[in-house]
């Protein structure tokens, strides 16, 4: 009986995992095509140059605790709390640091031979806005670990599809209204916000 239940859970997990990955690929491609028709390469360049800083910051604030929590043999409520507050605290510090460094990042690209049609002075406010995603993502790190650990594949698929759809529609709408790279930046932040809100909704340890 227990073996059949395990097989059933595994089959459902594989099914929802496939649905989530397939939907993410299809929706990501479709929304990407729409955005590409509305935005210029320079728009993508304005946001793209900031991604390396976001990637590094996210790697530092996570520090492997998410997967360690997900793979630990036994996890207590206090363990989730500890990881949650560590990630939030780290993200807040990193955001404050990057907020301060934003003008220097702008100056670096202004001095380099960076071929882009936009006024690079706009990189400072754009960077400070994009870096907000570091903090919002940290608020859902422990919750993601909970969903991963408890094999809630269906919920993860729903979260991915919903977050991608909402954030992409926001980005496309803003791009259509003429906000150019701000639409792309808002899409990224909106995705992390939607993810985090839904992680909290489906996680019961809080």
Regions found by a protein language model. Name each.
Residues 1-28, 67, 75-85, 120-124, ...:
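N-terminal membrane topogenesis motif
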Residues 6-65, 90-102, 110-111, 128, ...:
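Signature of the first transmembrane helix
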Residues 36-39, 70, 106, 148, ...:
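Helix-capping/transition residues at the boundaries of transmembrane alpha-helices
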Residues 38-41, 77, 120, 150, ...:
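Helix-loop interface residues and adjacent transmembrane-helix termini in multi-pass membrane transporters
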Residues 59-77, 148-149:
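Helix-loop junctions and terminal segments of transmembrane helices
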Residues 66, 142-149, 153, 176-177, ...:
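C-terminal transmembrane helix end/exit motif
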Residues 66-67, 95-108, 138-148:
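Transmembrane alpha-helix boundary signature
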Residues 81-90, 140-164:
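Substrate-agnostic recognition of the 12-TM MFS/MFS-like secondary transporter fold
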């Amino acid at each position: 009986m227990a073996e059949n239940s395990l097989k059933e859970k595994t089959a459902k997990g594989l099914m929802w995992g496939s649905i989530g990955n397939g939907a993410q690929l299809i929706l990501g491609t479709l929304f990407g095509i729409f955005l590409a028709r509305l935005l210029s390469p320079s728009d993508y360049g304005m946001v793209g140059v900031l991604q390396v800083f976001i990637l590094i910051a996210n790697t530092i604030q996570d520090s492997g605790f998410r997967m360690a929590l997900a793979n630990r043999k036994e996890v207590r409520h206090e363990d989730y709390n500890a990881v949650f507050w560590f990630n939030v605290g780290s993200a807040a510090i990193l955001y404050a640091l990057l907020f301060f460094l934003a003008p220097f990042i702008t100056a670096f690209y202004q001095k380099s031979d960076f071929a882009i049609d936009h006024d690079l002075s706009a990189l400072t406010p754009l960077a400070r806005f994009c870096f907000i995603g570091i903090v919002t993502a940290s608020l859902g790190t422990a919750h993601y670990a909970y969903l991963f650990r408890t094999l809630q594949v269906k919920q993860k698929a729903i979260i991915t599809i919903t977050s991608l759809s909402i954030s992409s529609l926001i980005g496309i709408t803003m791009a259509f209204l003429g906000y150019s790279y701000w639409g792309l930046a808002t899409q990224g932040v909106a995705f992390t916000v939607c993810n985090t809100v839904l992680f909290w909704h489906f996680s019961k340890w809080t």
